[in-house]
Structures are given as structure tokens and as C-alpha cells.
Amino acid sequence: MEHLVDINDVESEEIEQLLDLAASMKENPGEFSGVMDNKSLVMLFAKPSTRTRLSFETGMTQLGGHGIFFEMGSSQLSRGEPISDVSQVMSRYEDAIMARLFEHDEMMELAENADVPVVNGLTDFLHPCQALTDMFTMQEKDRLDTLAFVGDGNNVAHSLMQASAKMGVDCRIATPEGMEPDEEIQDRVSDANVTVTNDPYEAVDGATAVYGDVFVSMGEEEQREEKLAEFDGFQIDQDLMDAARDDAIFMHCLPAHRGEEVTAEVADGPQSVIFDQAENRMHVQKAIVHTLVNQ
């Protein structure tokens, strides 16, 4: 595994090893406190973030390394410097690059020109760190069986489909008509137990984990009212949760908009694991960066 840009490029065995390492790092943090000593991770941001920056930066500190925040808007990138040049320069200074970008093509260009590992912190097409964290959280809660995602067939759904296919998870994606996942992703997982439906109750039936995401993604604010209308009937409320397995967990990549994609009763209820899930981002990402840098 040279980079983590796309889960499709990672073998199932490598994912299992990453999740095992993340579990060890979470359970015994002291054993890993110096494994990234004198190592640096540059964190390239084109999109605002809370969890991505905090989890990567704190994770590097816990491993004895250093995270460097780099905002594209205040750099020469905003004045037209090619991302391929920036990638090569960063490779001379840093031990790894994490990027949170809009365009997936830019992420691929970054990785293609880097001489150090590149980690995809998010693009509009994929969110691999989140999906691997979700597999870890389901495994930690003994719910790594059937995942129902209710929302937009976007980057999170794409990576969940791919991660589920790699891990043998029964994955159901419920979206309004016209918002289904990209056909390229559906083709990639066509041999796996991944289904797409326009009926949230069909998706949730018997699921061990029910997953929500925002109805209005970053950059879609002007379409807010239109998007909310299209998602009518897709809110995750207690009635929908009751259609899942009795011990199902509720997951969300955050930020959550209570009263839109999920009710407060569910988001803050006993089935919710959203803050365990948020914490686990840090541990899984520590495992990813450590593995890539020290392999």
C-alpha cells in the first residue's frame, strides 16, 4: 500500500491489519508514543474541517510526530501553482501528506507526483478514512454484519460501499431517486453484497448499523430547500431505527443536523455511537499514517 487514496486499491488483508493496529493503538497508546518521532505530516486543506484536522494533528502528536496545517487558500496554490509542483516540494520536506480537497482528480495528481505517502482526508468522490473508521467502529461494537446507509449517494456512501465489499459486510444504500451512488462505484462492487434502493425501510430491515449523513453537503447551501424537499421521508427517526435489529447502532460521520437527516431522539439516544465513531477516526488514521510511513 503506497498511498491511501481509494479503498479499491487496498487489499482486504491490509484493511484487517490496519484495524488490528488501530485497536492496539487505542487500547495501549503508550506503546506507540514514539513511533513517529521526528516524522512530520503536512495536512493540506481546501475544505473547512473540524474532525479531520483535530484527529490527524492530535494523532501525530500522540505518536511522537508533528502535524503541519497548510491551508490552500493562503498558499501559492491559490495563485495558480500546480498541485504537482507542490506535491514534489512537500515530498522533500515531509514524511507524508494528508489532503482534504474538493476534486478527486487533484487528489490523484497529488499522489502521482509525491515521493511520500498520500492520505485522502476527503474528496467530493471518496472518503476512505471515514469508511475504514466505520468498519472499525462496527467491529468494535460487534456489529460488523449489515450496514444501512440512508442519505445521499455521495463520497461517504461510495467509500462505505467499497469498504463493505472488502470486509464482507452486507451494505444497503437508500437514497432518493436520482441521488444514487456513482455508477463507477456500483460497478466496482457489483460482485459484493451491496444493494441500492429508494426505500429506507427496505435498507434498514434487520440491519446491525444504521448510518446517516447530511442532506445538504458542503458547497450545496444554495440548493438547501430543494435538497431537503427531495429527502422527505428519509429522516432517520426512532420508527426507522425500530425496523433495524433490536441491538442496532446509529452512526453518523458528523456534523449532524438534528431535525433534518436524523432526530435528536436517535442522535442522542442509547443506540447512538457517533462520538465513539468520531474518536475512532483518530486511532484508525494513526494506524494508516504509521503503516504508510514505516512500511
Swiss-Prot record:
Q: Give the enzyme's EC designation.
A: 2.1.3.3
GO annotations under biological process? arginine biosynthetic process via ornithine; arginine catabolic process to ornithine; citrulline biosynthetic process
- Entry keyword set: Arginine metabolism, Cytoplasm, Plasmid, Transferase
Give yes or no: UniProt keyword Transferase: yes
- Coiled-coil positions: none
Q: Which InterPro entries match?
A: Asp/Orn_carbamoyltranf_P-bd (IPR006132), Asp/Orn_carbamoylTrfase (IPR006130), Asp/Orn_carbamoylTrfase_sf (IPR036901), Asp_carbamoyltransf_Asp/Orn-bd (IPR006131), Orn/put_carbamltrans (IPR002292), OTCase_ArgI (IPR024904)
Any Gene Ontology CC annotation = cytoplasm
Pathway assigned in UniProt: Amino-acid degradation; L-arginine degradation via ADI pathway; carbamoyl phosphate from L-arginine: step 2/2
What controls how active this protein is? Arginine lead to a slight activation. Inhibited by all nucleotide phosphates.
Other comments?
Answer: Not stable below 1 M KCl.
Q: How does it assemble?
A: Homohexamer.
Name the record gives this protein: Ornithine carbamoyltransferase, catabolic
Which organism is the protein's source?
Halobacterium salinarum (strain ATCC 700922 / JCM 11081 / NRC-1)
Per the UniProt record, the lineage of the source organism begins with:
Archaea, Methanobacteriati, Methanobacteriota, Stenosarchaea group, Halobacteria
